[in-house]
Amino acid sequence: MSNTEERCDLSSSRDCPERHEHLLQRVTARAAEIGGGITVSRLMPSRQRRMIGAWCFLDHAGPAEFEPGGGLAVGPHPHIGLQTFTWMIQGEALHRDSLGNVQVIRPGQVNLMTAGHGIAHTEESLPDERHAHAAQLWIALPYEQRDIAPAFDHHPDLPRWQEQGVTFTLLAGALAGRQAPCRLYSPLLGADLACHDASTLQLTLDPHFEYGLLPLEGGLEVGGEHFAVNELAYLGDGRDGLQLQLDPGARVLLLGGAPFGAEIFMWWNFVGHSKGEIARAQKAWEEGDARFGRLDALEGPRLSAPPIPWKIDAE
């Protein structure tokens, strides 16, 4: 679940309004196709909200049903300057990358791929799979770590507990005295909140974090406003607690993080701290450069990068 769009605009983290304490903002999704006929709801980046902490990309895929042999099919494509983060809710998918990793991700598991200097990978549904429901996110790497060696980690066992009528699964960071196993480079939080019956939930927050709440199923009410599936509730920093009302059968993705101080640029499947970093990565990918690892380990035709939409000599 990556960016396969042929027309890509350059995105800067400073393109949208500054965060404000106690802000409550509704961010609406747009449809994007990612391969294999799978359409996702893309929440970030958008003109309304570029980032939540270091979280800089958010797709909600599904719930989708398809014929066997269909589903997710994203060919070899590159990344730099980020970590990809996949939370699988329903269905199974196969990850392959240019480091030689081959890994099936199943419901309740997380795949975390650190691109750093450069990596390439593929994503596809298993042959007999008929369902897909997942959240795909990117995490921008800080300037000091933007060029680290690539890596891949699979996390099948995550902290899970029940509280206030809600089942919590901790995906990233720390919450309620628990710590997720994911290796991160910025202060972040990710959690899945699911309930059977309608629930009122009191959350303890870090006032130094900004937050987002995305209903993946059902809906929620916060600050007197109701948010449906694929409506992201963005909350500025400055809160030490929050009360939520969850609809019956709701599932909500909770994201948080310390505001990302540096400006980053996003274009196609690249994150850079300058446009020059992105332009160099695009050129290296089109030339089949060894920067992106063993491309012969990946099956299928490579995705071609769109032309750079700005003047390279103006860097």
From Swiss-Prot:
Pfam families in the record: Pirin, Pirin_C
Where does the chain bind a divalent metal cation?
H77, H79, H121, E123
The keyword Oxidoreductase belongs to this UniProt entry's keyword annotation? yes
Going by the UniProt record, its keywords in alphabetical order are: Dioxygenase, Metal-binding, Oxidoreductase
As cofactor, the record names: a divalent metal cation
InterPro entries in the cross-refs: Pirin, Pirin_C_dom, Pirin_N_dom, RmlC-like_jellyroll, RmlC_Cupin_sf
| Pathway participation | Flavonoid metabolism; quercetin degradation
Cofactor stoichiometry and binding remark: Binds 1 divalent metal cation.
Q: Which GO terms describe its molecular function?
A: metal ion binding; quercetin 2,3-dioxygenase activity
Superkingdom of the organism of origin: Bacteria
Question: What reaction does this enzyme carry out catalytically?
Answer: quercetin + O2 = 2-(3,4-dihydroxybenzoyloxy)-4,6-dihydroxybenzoate + CO
Q: EC number(s) per UniProt?
A: 1.13.11.24
To which protein family does this belong?
A: Belongs to the pirin family.
Role summary: Putative quercetin 2,3-dioxygenase.
Name it. Answer: Putative quercetin 2,3-dioxygenase PA1205
